[in-house]
Amino acid sequence: MHENERYAAGLQVRRAVLGNAHVDRSLAARTPFTEEFQEFITRTAWGTVWTREGLPRHTRSLLTLAMMVARGHDEEFKLHVRAARNNGVSADEIKEVLLQAAIYCGVPAANHAFALAAPILAEQAAEGGANAAD
C-alpha cells in the first residue's frame, strides 16, 4: 500500500475508533512542529497496525486499555475507554480488563484506572451512548 493510501486508510479507522470530533480536534491543533507526528500516528498506528486483519478492533481495544493501564498513560486510557465502547466493548469487559490489570500491573494502577473509567462509563450510560444498556 502506498503511503498516501495508508494514511487515508488510517484516517478512516482513526475516525471510526476515536470519533470524528477527537480526530478533527487533533488535526486542527497541528502545528508545523507536530504535523509530521500526527501524520506518523495516522499512517503507522492507524493505517498499519489497526487496519491489520489479525485481530478484530474489539480485541485491539481491550489490549490497548491494558497497555495504557500498565504504562500509566491516563489521558490515552480515557480516550481509549471511549474508543473501546465505539468498538463494541462492554462496560463489563472493561471491568474485567481492569481486574486483570490489578493482578499484573498492581492494585494501585487498576484502582486509578477504575476511577478514570467510571465517570466516562456513567456519562455514556446517562446519554444513552455506546453500549449504554450493559
Language-model-derived ranges and their functions:
Residues 20, 48, 67, 73, ...:
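Gly/Ser/Thr-rich helix-start
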Residues 62-65, 69-95:
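Mid-chain, well-packed structural core segment of small domains
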Residues 41-45, 62-67, 97-102, 113:
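Short alpha-helical scaffolding segments that buttress acidic/His motifs in well-ordered protein cores
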Residues 76, 100, 107-108:
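Substrate/cofactor-recognition hotspot
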Residues 1-58, 86, 112-134:
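Acidic, glycine/proline-rich low-complexity segments that act as flexible tails and inter-domain linkers
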Residues 88-91, 104-111, 115:
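Short, amphipathic alpha-helical segments
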